[in-house]
């Protein structure tokens, strides 16, 4: 297969049918994207003469088991993605020579540690090393990050850093984070309670931060964020996973916050009063956040909220929706609240609601809204175009539209 001598951008899908190596030149190639390539279609075989001007190399979804050695000669390489491959380690003698690298994408790989040579990449802006292992509902240990070199703060150009495991070397990593003043997105796993103060002091220095994700060492371990006095002023997305002794008071000052996920917080009081006046909040997810029996969405609050998820409130018996609250809400999901036997009181006020979804909710609740049975509350949700009941069964999701329920209010 021949192509122009001065080709600069190339996308390869699958395999090349006719391997005539002398017809392929990569001398002018700047960008190479490989999708679903065969195991034998390596960079060296594709371009025997090399492609030393290559700046972008994307191996996403390729059947790679090892870090591609051929990249050691790609001095001009700025972008390298090995996303969703089986690569397990990054050789220091290779990565340390890619001095112009700006993006290293190792998402969905098996890499769990980076060599100290990564610190030589002073132009590195995006460092993404993590993997999700989700089966069914959200699980605390479903996300795996990486161990970073202690001097990670030397990478002054970093803008995205996800997900670093912080429970190493007596909290050295948490102190180093404050040196990364250009960070816009930061993901931290396994933050120890005793490192909370050092972590907060570092976060206060990250004034350009737009997204912050923090997880404790375990779902019963505390995230201590009480020492954070001046949060990043432009923070838009905040994800906290782990016990909170109390909801950080500084959250109320985040006027740019549009997305907030709180998981396994186990608060003793209703957190909504501290969140309801956030002016930009559009997406709120709460999982095992509150031990009480009532959630009250007060009249006239949550003005911009479009998506709301409530999951695993073990003591929850009642949800109250006041008039003119959540006027923009389009999607509401409620899951695994075993004591909640009726739909939210006042749900009929949510005029813009397009999707209402229940996950493994009690049969008693579903019977109250069944259109073919005694559903006394069906009129409250009849204005919602899409109503679903979803169940986790046999390692998969079963989704039923409400109008498919039989007269005994069970999925057909």
Feature names for model-found ranges:
Residues 351-412:
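C-terminal capping region of solenoid repeat domains
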């Amino acid at each position: 297969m021949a192509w122009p001598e001065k080709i600069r951008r190339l996308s390869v899908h699958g395999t090349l049918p006719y391997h005539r190596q002398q017809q392929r030149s990569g001398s002018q190639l700047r960008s190479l994207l490989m999708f679903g390539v065969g195991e034998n279609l390596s960079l060296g075989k594709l371009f025997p003469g090399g492609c030393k001007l290559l700046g972008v190399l994307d191996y996403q979804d390729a059947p790679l088991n090892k870090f591609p050695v051929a990249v050691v000669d790609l001095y001009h390489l700025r972008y390298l993605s090995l996303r969703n491959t089986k690569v397990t380690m990054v050789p220091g003698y290779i990565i340390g020579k890619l001095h112009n690298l700006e993006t290293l994408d190792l998402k969905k790989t098996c890499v769990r540690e980076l060599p100290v040579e990564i610190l030589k990449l002073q132009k590195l802006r995006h460092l993404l090393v993590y993997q999700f292992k989700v089966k069914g509902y959200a699980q605390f240990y479903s996300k795996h990050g990486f161990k970073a070199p202690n001097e990670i703060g030397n990478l002054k150009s970093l803008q995205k850093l996800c997900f670093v495991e912080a429970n190493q070397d007596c909290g050295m990593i948490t102190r180093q984070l404050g040196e990364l003043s250009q960070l816009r997105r930061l993901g931290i796993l396994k933050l120890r309670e005793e490192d909370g103060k050092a972590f907060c002091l570092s976060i206060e220095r990250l004034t350009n931060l737009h997204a912050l994700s923090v997880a404790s060492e375990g779902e019963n371990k505390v995230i201590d964020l009480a020492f954070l006095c001046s949060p990043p002023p432009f923070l838009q997305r905040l994800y906290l996973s782990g016990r909170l002794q109390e909801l950080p008071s500084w959250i109320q000052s985040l006027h740019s916050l549009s997305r907030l996920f709180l998981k396994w917080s186990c608060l003793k009081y209703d957190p909504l009063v501290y969140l309801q006046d956030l002016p930009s909040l559009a997406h709120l997810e709460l999982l095992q956040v509150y031990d009480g029996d009532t959630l009250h969405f007060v009249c006239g609050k949550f003005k911009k909220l479009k998506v709301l998820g409530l999951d695993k409130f073990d003591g929850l018996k009642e949800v109250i929706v006041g008039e003119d609250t959540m006027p923009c809400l389009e999607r509401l999901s409620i899951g695994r609240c075993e004591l909640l036997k009726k739909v939210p009181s006042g749900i009929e006020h949510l005029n813009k609601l397009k999707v209402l979804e229940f996950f493994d909710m009690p049969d008693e609740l579903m019977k109250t809204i069944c259109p073919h049975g005694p559903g006394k509350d069906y009129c409250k949700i009849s204005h919602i175009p899409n109503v679903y009941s979803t169940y986790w069964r046999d390692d998969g999701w079963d989704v039923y539209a409400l109008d498919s329920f039989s007269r005994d209010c069970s999925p057909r």
